Structure formats: C-alpha cells, structure tokens
Amino acid sequence: MSNRTLLAFDFGTKSIGVAIGQEITGTARALTSFKAQEGIPDWQKVEKLLSEWQPDLVVVGLPLNMDGTEQPLTARARKFANRLHGRFGVAIELHDERLSTVEARADLFERGGFKALDKGSVDAASAVIILESWFEAQH
C-alpha cells in the first residue's frame, strides 16, 4: 500500500466541499468548502489548496441517481474534474457519491444537532465520505 495524499471534492453548483486523506491509513478529514457560481469555483482557491497539500490524486464525487444512471449534475461534475486536470495537471478519479450528503447530514446531526448542519460543514463532510468510500473500494 502506498502513502499517497489525496484530496476529494464534493462538487455542487453552489458549494464545493473538500477533504484530505492518506491512502496508507485509509482515513480522511474535512478540510474546507467554498462557494461556486453555477458550478464554477474560485479557481484561485482551488489552486491554493492543490499547492498547499500537493495531492498525488484528486477524487471527485460523481453524482448518480439511485439506479446508477446519470443525472444533469453528473455531466457538470465530470466537467469540473476535467477542468481540474486540464488547469493543474493533477491525476483525477471519479467516484460514485450516491447518498454521501444524506450520510454526512446524519453524521453531523448526530454530533451537533441542527446547528451542525450548515452547508459548508455538510459539503466538507460529504467529501470525507466520498474519499473514505474510495479508500474502501481500493481494497
């Protein structure tokens, strides 16, 4: 098992959550979230994250319907992943993110009630779930 550093993005049209993790431990933690305008992030913030954390791989959550089919947001998440690769040359993997937001909301509520459910916290927690799910799928 390698000790790669990974960043995960939970893509959304209004907000994007970010998590960081280490492949050797298979664990991730919430890093941040930032606003997006119609799915377009502040690319300077993205560049700062990539520069600061120097990930070996970036995992982008792929929103799918429960039956596994694509939805309108799926194409936008793919486009975001392609732009990440094109702008910064980072290796990208897409990973099924079905139910990550539901799970994140439940986890946050359990720990802090309604006050823990702000949008940024939910998005960053969703990115953690996406990355931990990716780790599990590798084994």
UniProtKB/Swiss-Prot annotation:
Enzyme class: hydrolase
One GO BP annotation of this record: rRNA 5'-end processing
InterPro entries to which the protein is assigned, alphabetical: RNaseH-like_sf, YqgF, YqgF/RNaseH-like_dom, YqgF/RNaseH-like_dom_sf
SUPFAM superfamilies: Ribonuclease H-like
A molecular function (GO) term: nuclease activity
UniProt entry tagged with the keyword Metal-binding: no
Family: Belongs to the YqgF nuclease family.
Name this polypeptide is given: Putative pre-16S rRNA nuclease
Taxonomic source organism: Pectobacterium atrosepticum (strain SCRI 1043 / ATCC BAA-672) (Erwinia carotovora subsp. atroseptica)
